[in-house]
Amino acid sequence: MAFKDLRDFIALLEEKGQLKRISHPVDPYLEITEISDRTLRAGGPALLFENVVGHTTPVLANLFGTPDRVAMGMGQENVGALREVGELLAFLKEPEPPKGMKDAWEKLPIFKQVLNMAPKLIKNAPCQEFEVSGEDVDLTAIPIQTCWPGDAAPLVTWPLVVTKGPHKDRQNLGIYRMQLIGKNKLIMRWLSHRGGALDFREWQQQHPGENFPVSVALGADPATILGAVTPVPDTLSEYAFAGLLRGSKTEVTKSRGNDLQVPASAEYILEGHIAPGEMADEGPFGDHTGYYNEVDSFPVFTVERITHRKDPIYHSTYTGRPPDEPAVLGVALNEVFVPILKKQFPEIVDFYLPPEGCSYRMAVVTMKKQYPGHAKRVMLGVWSFLRQFMYTKFVIVTDDDVNARDWNDVIWALTTRVDPMRDTTMIDNTPIDYLDFASPVSGLGSKMGIDATNKWPGETNREWGTTIEMTAEVKNKVDAIWDKLGIDDK
């Protein structure tokens, strides 16, 4: 499945009964959130609100509201197929040298495919069919959602922010929410370690006192959107990765007011700058934790120009207590993470981010334990290997006889294989999500690792328990006579 733009994806979803057009008048103030939330929790379709109160532009919501739709957006038939995407990323992250001529020939197509996926620069792009600039810029004309009753303002939730540092060979694509504070002003909420913030910091050092150019795409094609939230190796651009997912080069075009390249098929492009020293208080907003976050100061993005397609569609979402779209994305991307982790730690059998853990705050790992202390090595490896797990507060490691995705199994392992004093690892003063108000200091807190594996000699002085298992002979015998017993008869 290859989607040139968001509209291609919408058409396929509608064909498969996975998109619902809503003609009834719906308000972007709170109502779209409530409808989307109920639909997502029921495993329902993507929603295209065609009659948005106060606006002529339709709103697309709940696009990635099921793991299968995430997989479809990444060009795969189902969630299980995302393991193949993870295997490709694992190879690209740490490619192994060929073991011989035959191996070299087998790997050659992969390298050629990657090299051939550099974005394609085009002119006369659909995203630039129409333009408003200067005094005519009016962000309030876009049906930006106000998601929750306590939110400070309307919030842009699916912006693909394009930046480039002065010393970087390639652009950074990141998704950072943006609060509307004026007809041409948005607050850019990027945390200090994120790519956009790092680019901005380098720019200020290289060009003190100068405005930092920024472009933002709204409503890009699904592969490009999902490429921006996937752990792409530093050697591969998000545009190139989107091309690999799509099977064709990502078409980009040069912004009209700066040199940044933006997705050519996006519904909207916002062009502008961040002026040095221009900051504003952002929030509070309801977030993926299920709570309102604290107010904090972030840079202001001044929009100088808006270009858009004919009859544009505004792509939006909300975040709230799981399940929400970020949690669903986490479930799907979980399958991408597994091969990447297993390449670094072959002893890992499965890795699971429970969606109720706010996408990434808790991880469960099952492994083939090989020596005393092995579980601790794995938990420390999870925290340090991918930047996506830097904010994971709890890591539970257990044996491969436990199903990481079954809480009955996990709780059994925790309560039977763990001594809290011996098997708990606490790490203080580590990076924590700024939205985590439970930490004593904003952005800095502790982590807990729990070793729920069977203990080896050296880890305990006691005789370890043996699990109870029925013999295969008896199981087979009962299977053969089960229907005759009449137990399942109603």
Swiss-Prot record:
Catalysis performed (reactions): a 4-hydroxy-3-(all-trans-polyprenyl)benzoate + H(+) = a 2-(all-trans-polyprenyl)phenol + CO2
Annotated GO MF terms: 3-octaprenyl-4-hydroxybenzoate carboxy-lyase activity; metal ion binding
Active-site feature positions: 287
EC number(s) per entry: 4.1.1.98
Cofactor: how bound: Binds 1 prenylated FMN per subunit.
Cofactor: prenylated FMN; Mn(2+)
InterPro entries: UbiD (IPR002830), UbiD-like_C (IPR049381), UbiD-like_N (IPR049383), UbiD_bacteria (IPR023677), UbiD_Rift_dom (IPR048304)
Coarse class of the protein's main subcellular location: membrane
Any single GO BP term: ubiquinone biosynthetic process
Pathway named in the protein's UniProt entry: Cofactor biosynthesis; ubiquinone biosynthesis
GO cellular component: cytosol; plasma membrane
Membrane disposition: Peripheral membrane protein
Annotated positions binding Mn(2+): 172, 238
One Pfam family of this chain: UbiD
Location relative to the cell: Cell membrane
Binding site for prenylated FMN: 175-177, 189-191, 194-195
Transmembrane feature ranges: none
Keywords: Cell membrane, Decarboxylase, Flavoprotein, FMN, Lyase, Manganese, Membrane, Metal-binding, Ubiquinone biosynthesis
Family named by the database record: Belongs to the UbiD family.
Subunit-level organization: Homohexamer.
Function: Catalyzes the decarboxylation of 3-octaprenyl-4-hydroxy benzoate to 2-octaprenylphenol, an intermediate step in ubiquinone biosynthesis.
Name recorded for this polypeptide: 3-octaprenyl-4-hydroxybenzoate carboxy-lyase
Organism name: Saccharophagus degradans (strain 2-40 / ATCC 43961 / DSM 17024)
Lineage: Bacteria, Pseudomonadati, Pseudomonadota, Gammaproteobacteria, Cellvibrionales
